Amino acid sequence: MATVRISSTSMTKAVLRSQTTNKLITNKSYNLSVGSTKRVSRSFGLKCSANSGGATMSAVYKVKLLGPDGQEDEFEVQDDQYILDAAEEAGVDLPYSCRAGACSTCAGQIVSGNVDQSDGSFLEDSHLEKGYVLTCVAYPQSDCVIHTHKETELF
């Protein structure tokens, strides 16, 4: 997961060592603002948000869903967000039931890209080898293209 957590103390003060005496120099401090953290994180394709005195950065990937009738929906998904949740936020209507990876209602098949679906328990190794994915427990690990509505193909 591409998340970086920085405590407020490490963001606001850095202590330098003197090269000649190897003693701590505590009278100098350097500030790193959340604003500059956001700017730098965007250059690496990360989103940054402030939270309780720190900053959190997540990678963001493009996910394209290909529906059974040829419709295409593309939206951004953070690497710590399930694809189904992001689809709903983007206004995409997908089938689901358990939201826990314990059934096959939300099944899709990966055309390209990688996901982490270690939270799921329903799919067998043979399904995973064929690229099947449960969108309710799948975190993107790259840009992805996924065919949706694949539950009937699992049986």
Curated annotation (Swiss-Prot):
Limits of the 2Fe-2S ferredoxin-type domain: 61-152
Record: residues binding [2Fe-2S] cluster: 98, 103, 106, 136
InterPro entries to which the protein is assigned, alphabetical: 2Fe-2S_ferredoxin-like_sf, 2Fe-2S_ferredoxin-type, 2Fe2S_fd_BS, Beta-grasp_dom_sf, Fd_pln
Transit peptide, from-to: 1-49
Major subcellular location class: plastid
N-acetylalanine PTM positions: 50
UniProt-listed GO biological process terms: electron transport chain
Cofactor-binding details, from the entry: Binds 1 [2Fe-2S] cluster.
PROSITE patterns named in the record: 2FE2S_FER_1 (PS00197), 2FE2S_FER_2 (PS51085)
Gene Ontology molecular function, alphabetical: 2 iron, 2 sulfur cluster binding; electron transfer activity; metal ion binding
Pfam family, one: Fer2
Protein's name in the database: Ferredoxin-3, chloroplastic
Classification lineage: Eukaryota, Viridiplantae, Streptophyta, Embryophyta, Tracheophyta
